[in-house]
Amino acid sequence: MTQVAKKILVTCALPYANGSIHLGHMLEHIQADVWVRYQRMRGHEVNFICADDAHGTPIMLKAQQLGITPEQMIGEMSQEHQTDFAGFNISYDNYHSTHSEENRQLSELIYSRLKENGFIKNRTISQLYDPEKGMFLPDRFVKGTCPKCKSPDQYGDNCEVCGATYSPTELIEPKSVVSGATPVMRDSEHFFFDLPSFSEMLQAWTRSGALQEQVANKMQEWFESGLQQWDISRDAPYFGFEIPNAPGKYFYVWLDAPIGYMGSFKNLCDKRGDSVSFDEYWKKDSTAELYHFIGKDIVYFHSLFWPAMLEGSNFRKPTNLFVHGYVTVNGAKMSKSRGTFIKASTWLNHFDADSLRYYYTAKLSSRIDDIDLNLEDFVQRVNADIVNKVVNLASRNAGFINKRFDGVLASELADPQLYKTFTDAAEVIGEAWESREFGKAIREIMALADLANRYVDEQAPWVVAKQEGRDADLQAICSMGINLFRVLMTYLKPVLPKLTERAEAFLNTELTWDGIQQPLLGHKVNPFKALYNRIDMKQVEALVEASKEEVKAAAAPVTGPLADDPIQETITFDDFAKVDLRVALIENAEFVEGSDKLLRLTLDLGGEKRNVFSGIRSAYPDPQALIGRHTIMVANLAPRKMRFGISEGMVMAAGPGGKDIFLLSPDAGAKPGHQVK
């Protein structure tokens, strides 16, 4: 039956840009990719997008620890993430970042519309403040006991056990994650999104029947407990977008993160020009379909805040949320010590992507159930299903076709009714892919694979090949087996992209959903090459060991300049503005009699001379070599009386000290007296 082509926009939750992709992440991206690939096979216009979630205090602090800018860190992490997803053949049309101009503009637009419509409220709140670090503590930098279910060691914004959201001030026995100190309360003006104003709309959306039953039930609990206004602002220091007309206030990461879906799509539209319209997908009355694949830990944000923000700013709401559970490994939470906290890149060093794609797909359903990656079962299932049932079907027939018939298939089907049984299954299997009942689809396909192999066993082409005068029978039997293999691989194409490429090369034809209605008759296939190799537990053992070694390496003491000389506590811009840095010309440099550490520098500031003592003698044993160089000095440092005279400032140098100290110099063109800005 011909389907009407639909316009579909699909997203995955945005990975946070401060860590590597691991097998927990990959469940969602594989699930979405399988669904997207099926939709494309059915002729729908699908735009599949994602981005890195690149804002927040965790990124700011980690960048400080690494001694790089947040922009540099998120740029490097984006490349790593995209490499990992490409390695697993996730077919994104666009991968972007929330730290983008598109996202800034859309965040400001949505905020301004919400404000104009009266949905932004200002009020002063008491906020947790780290007295040791001198900073307000973001939600994720406070931990304590959940005020709802009393689970310990929960973050300050939501509980990973019961899913509740709350204010950090509601935590029981809170502690600063940054310093371990007990936070104190400080007042600060914050901006709030008036979520309760959307309660009626959200309840109607929940009752529409579009959402998973488990999601709808959970939302009903939240409605019954009452919706609260949502704090959408954070105080400096913070890495993110500053709120318009509110100096020192920034959008909370969870405000601009989902807008990142729109930002990534806008970036894609700009790349493609007129071929894709942003408004066609995001306008209020859009007929395009919008689906978010997310984990169960972020349902609250996507089912309440996000649709309310869109409604309040005159954009369309999602068609549906597709929510999945967590990943466990060998029946337990992923563990670094056991080597089961496995990065995506580590997996790809030991196994191919199709193997994990198949295993996850075989276990997924439309329910929000956790998926266990049992590594022994993984090996057995991949070998039993992909190798023994599917690939073996091709290999045991292709040899005869290639050797005895020059690769040409029979002109008629040996068993048309059996072939019809296979093609008739397209409706059931297609519906399973469509409804995300992936495990059911795999079971249906493997049942067909069993039928196909039973047919070959019963026809025994290896026996027929030895019997004189039965060449036509041999060709018919093996051609039938290869045609059944083609149908199976067509059904598996959304799951196994790399195996599909090899199968298409052998079959000498593209695998399409509707194409299986016409079998390959009198068709020439290519010489058969091994399509897939068996895997074994030795590979699993090597994978686990490699993961353990990565953890050990990451836990090793950090060495280098930052470890030896950590970054000082954060200062305000006003503090920094007090320091007056100027370009200075070194007119003279000489040893200081009686000191084995100091040099006396005569500096020209462009009309004013300064005398400065600097402890750089060990690094510059020939002071005359410094004469004529430009350097940077602190020009407004109070004069300091020393045994050898008065020092009227300080020159800037880098390094640990002694011989390893390096005088800073400005770029060519800087003049004495120029202010460093």
Curated annotation (Swiss-Prot):
The domain of life is Bacteria
Q: Which residues bind ATP?
A: 336
Named from the GO MF annotations, one term is:
metal ion binding
Cellular compartments annotated:
Cytoplasm
Q: Report any Pfam family annotated for this entry.
A: tRNA-synt_1g
For whether the record's keyword set contains Protein biosynthesis, the answer is yes
Q: Which GO terms describe its biological process?
A: methionyl-tRNA aminoacylation
Q: How is the cofactor bound?
A: Binds 1 zinc ion per subunit.
**Domain tRNA-binding residues, every copy:** 575-677
Which keywords appear in this protein's UniProt record, sorted alphabetically?
Aminoacyl-tRNA synthetase, ATP-binding, Cytoplasm, Ligase, Metal-binding, Nucleotide-binding, Protein biosynthesis, RNA-binding, tRNA-binding, Zinc
Matches recorded under InterPro entries:
aa-tRNA-synth_I_CS (IPR001412), Anticodon_Met (IPR041872), Met-tRNA-synth_bsu_C (IPR004495), Met-tRNA_ligase_1 (IPR023458), Met-tRNA_synth (IPR014758), Methionyl/Leucyl_tRNA_Synth (IPR015413), MetRS_core (IPR033911), MetRS_Zn (IPR029038)
Q: So where does Zn(2+) get bound?
A: 146, 149, 159, 162
Q: Which GO terms describe its cellular component?
A: cytosol
Record's keyword annotation contains Nucleotide-binding: yes
Please tell me which stretches of this chain the record labels as motif 'HIGH' region.
15-25
Question: Which CDD domains does the UniProt entry name for this protein?
Answer: Anticodon_Ia_Met, MetRS_core, tRNA_bind_EcMetRS_like
Main localization, broad class: cytoplasm
Per the record, what are the reactions this protein catalyses?
Answer: tRNA(Met) + L-methionine + ATP = L-methionyl-tRNA(Met) + AMP + diphosphate
Protein family (similarity comment): Belongs to the class-I aminoacyl-tRNA synthetase family. MetG type 1 subfamily.
Described by its record, this protein's role is as follows: Is required not only for elongation of protein synthesis but also for the initiation of all mRNA translation through initiator tRNA(fMet) aminoacylation.
* Name of the protein: Methionine--tRNA ligase
Q: Which gene encodes it?
A: metG
